[in-house]
Every structure is written in C-alpha cells, then in structure tokens.
A protein has these predicted regions:
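Beta-propeller-forming repeat regions
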Residues: 1-191
Length: 191
C-alpha cells in the first residue's frame, strides 16, 4: 500500500509505503521529500499499521502492530518531531493468553470527542477467531490505555466471533468504528 501522510507540522508531506518482502515479512517505510531529495525516515517490520491523529495533536501519528515472539500483540505509537525523526510515544502489549496476532486496526472518534483505536486480534485455540480491544491515548500518562466505556473483559466476550471477515470498521462514514458481535447461536442449524 502507498499513501501520503501529514506526520509533522508544516507543509511537508510524507510518503508511507507498506510492502511484503520475498520471505513474506511485512515492512513499512516512511519517506520525506524535501528540497528535491527523497530520504528514508523510518523502515520497520509490522503486521498492521494505521496513519491517524490518535493523540489529538493535529498531525497524523503512526500506529504499528506486530506479533511478539510469545504470540502476544505489541502496539507502538510513533510521532514525528520537528526535526523529522520518529519518537516512540507509547508501547502497549496485549497478552498472548488472549491474542495470537493482529487481524485489523481502525480508528475513530467516540461520543466524548476522544480518538479511539479498535484492534481486532486473532484468538481462540485455533487462532482463527476474532475479538476486539478498544484503546485510547491518555494525554496524562502518554500511553495507550483501555477505554473506560466498557471493561476489556466484557468487550472481549461480546466481540468474540468466528468469522474472520467480520472486522471492526466505520461502516457508515460517521467517524465511529462499529465493532461486530456474533450471537451465541449464529450460523448454527438446529434440526
């Protein structure tokens, strides 16, 4: 994927490129074009990424998700400083007991006006089920924290689903991410 981003103050625009290497690993490269010179400002392995103003600072931020060696998920929030270098603002891990990887990530605004991330993670014994986590950036602690509208446990249970294509997304374009749920008997035929 290729996209343009406004990751730092001013008129400079960055080029964000996600690509797959020959061995199947995913990499993200961010380039800056200044005074006729294209330069790499970040190159990093990832599983999912998102460019969004999650900190509420007015510029877009870079959110990278990767799978840890123990199977958990790491969420990394990066911002660009005035010199054009990436700063790691926050890192958060999701337990391998719950998640085996990241299936998708979406960002939206809640009814309270805050910016939120919805992460859909692979879970279950087979690793083929999905469940969701709702996170927000806490300005006081400068960390990604679970949202307080619903407990992490309740959201995990309510969003547990066995249809891999049912990912969280803004379905109606209102800026709010819808999180799919699956009723207990969904997809079962009782005779």
């Amino acid at each position: 994927s290729v996209g343009l981003a406004q990751l730092q103050p001013g008129d400079a625009t960055q080029l964000v490129v996600g690509y797959t290497a020959a061995q199947g690993d995913h990499y993200l490269a961010v380039y800056s074009y200044t005074d006729g010179v294209l330069s790499t400002i970040l190159e990093q392995q990832y599983q999912q990424y998102l460019v969004e103003d999650i900190t509420g600072g007015g510029n877009q931020d870079l959110i990278l998700m990767s799978t840890l060696e123990d199977g958990g998920v790491q969420i990394e929030l990066l911002t660009v400083d005035k010199e054009g270098s990436f700063q790691q603002v926050a890192v958060m891990g999701l337990s391998a007991n719950r998640f085996a990887g990241c299936a998708s990530v979406a960002a939206g605004v809640g009814a309270d006006g805050r910016h939120y991330l919805v992460l859909d993670g692979w879970t279950g014994i087979s690793g083929n089920n999905l469940a969701s986590v709702l996170l927000r950036f806490d300005e006081d602690t400068q960390q990604m924290v679970p949202a307080d509208q619903i407990s992490t446990e309740k959201l995990y249970t309510a969003s547990l689903r066995n249809v891999p294509s049912l990912v969280s997304q803004d379905l109606d374009g209102d800026g709010i991410v819808e999180i799919p749920t699956q009723p207990d008997e969904a997809g079962l035929l009782n005779m």
